[in-house]
Amino acid sequence: MIYPYKEKMPTIAPSCFIADYVTITGDVTIGEESSIWFNTVIRGDVSPTIIGKRVNIQDQSTLHQSPNAPLLIEDDVTVGHQV
């Protein structure tokens, strides 16, 4: 499910793979050739979440951040299962 939060819609590169049952909301940017796997939640509700190119976010991970502290995952990073 991909949806806006406070009028900010996620930006996802066309070459990304987004598995079923993923939730992405708000101020989120996902770079080229990245993959987001089953049951992952990525929130950009209190600060931006920026995911680089060729990033692999594995199953059941939750990515969130604190106010005034954006989350940045640089290029070519793997985030393991259930992080």
Residue ranges of predicted features:
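Active-site beta-loop-alpha junctions enriched in small/polar residues
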Residues: 68
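Active-site cofactor/substrate anionic-group-binding motifs, chiefly glycine-
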Residues: 49
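Left-handed beta-helix
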Residues: 14, 19-20, 25-26, 31-32, ...
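Extreme N-terminal tail/first-helix region
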Residues: 1-16
